[in-house]
Curated annotation (Swiss-Prot):
The lineage of its organism: Bacteria, Bacillati, Bacillota, Bacilli, Bacillales. InterPro entries: Pra-immunoreactive (IPR051791), RDD (IPR010432). This is Uncharacterized protein YckC. GO terms for cellular component: plasma membrane. Its main location: membrane. The keyword Membrane applies. It is found in: Cell membrane. PANTHER family: LMO1584 PROTEIN, PROLINE-RICH ANTIGEN HOMOLOG-RELATED. The chain crosses the membrane at residues 14-34, 45-65, 91-111. Keywords: Cell membrane, Membrane, Transmembrane, Transmembrane helix. It is a multi-pass membrane protein.
Length: 151
């Protein structure tokens, strides 16, 4: 496994906050303006955000809007493009682990990102992913360079 240019805690937090501001806040406001109901009770908004989190990285080379703005993206641990299964594991299964452990999984992720050289969190380990600063194609170039050095 060749982890290349891993992204740390603060940049990942910034990307998550940007995603919340850019995606969730407008959805909440639109829902509230249209229905007059409390948007926090809406399964529709939860479903839209869930689909956004799973599908967009598959079709946009590992980027979500916040990650793209911050220059980071999600890749498989071998540097390849994420798949539906990968994102399902990363979002749904890891989310269930965080819920079942009453937040202890989240604390474990914070510790992992602080102490691991590859900056992989619990949801990265579950899904076989990591978050990188590398642009699409850059990992392959780095892998080719590493092979040439070893020859």
């Amino acid at each position: 496994m060749n982890i290349y240019k891993p992204a740390g805690f603060w940049i990942r937090l910034g990307a998550a906050l940007l995603d919340y501001i850019i995606v969730s806040v407008p959805l909440l406001l639109i829902y509230w303006l249209i229905t007059g109901k409390d948007p926090n009770d809406s399964m529709f908004i939860s479903l839209v955000v869930l689909l956004y989190s799973i599908l967009l990285p598959m079709f946009w080379r590992g980027y979500l809007i916040g990650k793209r703005i911050c220059g980071i993206r999600i890749v498989k641990k071998d540097g390849s493009q994420v798949s539906l299964l990968t994102m399902f594991l990363r979002v749904i299964v890891a989310g269930l682990v965080y819920c079942i452990t009453f937040g202890l999984g989240l604390i474990a992720s914070l510790i992992l990102i602080a102490v691991r050289e590859d900056k992989r969190t619990l949801h990265d380990l579950i899904a076989g992913t990591y978050v990188t600063y590398a642009t699409p194609g850059e990992e392959e170039l780095n892998a080719d360079e590493e092979i040439r050095k070893s020859e």
